[in-house]
Amino acid sequence: DILAAFRVTPQPGVPPEEAGAAVAAESSTGTWTTVWTDGLTSLDRYKGRCYHIEPVPGDPDQYICYVAYPLDLFEEGSXTNMFTSIVGNVFGFKALRVLRLEDLRIPVAYTKTFQGPPHGIQVERDKLNKYGRPLMGCTIKPKLGLSAKNYGRAVYECLRGGLDFTKDDENVNSQPFMRWRDRFLFCAEAIYKAQAETGEIKGHYLNATAGTCEEMMKRAIFARELGVPIVMHDYLTGGFTANTTLAHYCRDNGLLLHIHRAMHAVIDRQKNHGMHFRVLAKALRMSGGDHIHAGTVVGKLEGERDITLGFVDLLRDDYIEKDRSRGIYFTQDWVSLPGVIPVASGGIHVWHMPALTEIFGDDSVLQFGGGTLGHPWGNAPGAVANRVALEACVKARNEGRDLAAEGNVIIREACKWSPELSAACEVWKEIKFEFEAMDTLDK
């Protein structure tokens, strides 16, 4: 069975058992009345069952309801159908005040019907020939308004300075100021020029997201013909069907696939209603993607540390034990489905480097947009500053130093032999994003 954990807040007067049963029925075989065609099938075989209810500590009106869904309710290899069944209709149910899907347990039999990520973590490292450290990226800013040639120039400067990747912003598709084909050509030129100068393999996440699947595939095919290593997709706005289609193409044609989660906070930010990002992360691993944005813990975007580390493990590891202290409701066995690299992006800069290196480890992408392009000396020095800071943190960690305790000291030591890093440290020494997370663990 597929197991689901729902956070249920019933309407006043509705007992939790009735609310849990309603969720199970409405998201499987049930309807609002008895119908004569019920007698033509075996409802006992197909209906969802609410098998356990537990109160939420500190909130007498909320319950965690566990529902089991028989596997025959779902089409094989279709994240689209899985979500249509489990969350498609039930969230508008009048007997519930609010409802949130906290986690899913995907059984091995269903997991094996998915291709998963096009390549996975180890294959990506082998393609890029980069080992022993996090990868580094940069979102090109301003996100909208640059011409294709100026955009390509910014890409070149960042890659030349020492970054591994640069990135289209999620809303860069094919607008009047910069059509997709022009952007692809200038970015490819920038990649090849930077590779020739540095001797390192470089990439730019070329956003293939489009208004139709056919147009999306046309862009991905053009990227492959240019010989670039990676393309990008906005998987929530583009949809799971489009994403799985693109992931299959990427595996067949040797392209890495970077996934942006634009629109996720509409679904996952409120603690009481919607769907937790760990569910969206699991679905992405099944649908397919080699990278996905996963918050930063320390930057400008929402993300509590324990929760973030919980779904980072769900993205990367083969087997994850149930651990409610990190928000993981079920043990999950991925049976060798390739892992996804989490991307830390959003309001981060060189002073965050020790914390990011400690939190995310080597199998991650640390992405500095403003933290690269905002450098007072320009894009390339901004890239140099980030690369030097990362190398210093990795070296210190490998020597056994405590990044959490000595992080600032490590960065200041590196400043002595990198004027670019010293300038960056001066610019961002006062920048902090200290707000309490909306989505927190139950205490």
UniProtKB/Swiss-Prot annotation:
First-listed, main subcellular location of the protein, grouped into a coarse class: plastid
Active-site residues, record numbering mapped to chain: 141, 260
CDD domains according to UniProt: RuBisCO_large_I (cd08212)
Molecular-function GO terms, alphabetical: magnesium ion binding; monooxygenase activity; ribulose-bisphosphate carboxylase activity
Record note on quaternary structure: Heterohexadecamer of 8 large chains and 8 small chains; disulfide-linked. The disulfide link is formed within the large subunit homodimers.
One cellular component term from this protein's GO annotations in UniProt: chloroplast
UniProt keyword list: Calvin cycle, Carbon dioxide fixation, Chloroplast, Disulfide bond, Lyase, Magnesium, Metal-binding, Monooxygenase, Oxidoreductase, Photorespiration, Photosynthesis, Plastid
Subcellular location as annotated: Plastid, Chloroplast
One Pfam family recorded for the sequence: RuBisCO_large_N
Family (UniProt): Belongs to the RuBisCO large chain family. Type I subfamily.
Requisite cofactors: Mg(2+)
Protein name listed in UniProt: Ribulose bisphosphate carboxylase large chain
Job description of the protein: RuBisCO catalyzes two reactions: the carboxylation of D-ribulose 1,5-bisphosphate, the primary event in carbon dioxide fixation, as well as the oxidative fragmentation of the pentose substrate in the photorespiration process. Both reactions occur simultaneously and in competition at the same active site.
Catalytic activities: 2 (2R)-3-phosphoglycerate + 2 H(+) = D-ribulose 1,5-bisphosphate + CO2 + H2O; D-ribulose 1,5-bisphosphate + O2 = 2-phosphoglycolate + (2R)-3-phosphoglycerate + 2 H(+)
Post-translational modification: The disulfide bond which can form in the large chain dimeric partners within the hexadecamer appears to be associated with oxidative stress and protein turnover.
HAMAP family, A to Z: RuBisCO_L_type1
Enzyme's top EC category: lyase
Note: The basic functional RuBisCO is composed of a large chain homodimer in a 'head-to-tail' conformation. In form I RuBisCO this homodimer is arranged in a barrel-like tetramer with the small subunits forming a tetrameric 'cap' on each end of the 'barrel'.
Annotated site (Transition state stabilizer): 300
Chain sites annotated for binding Mg(2+): 167, 169-170
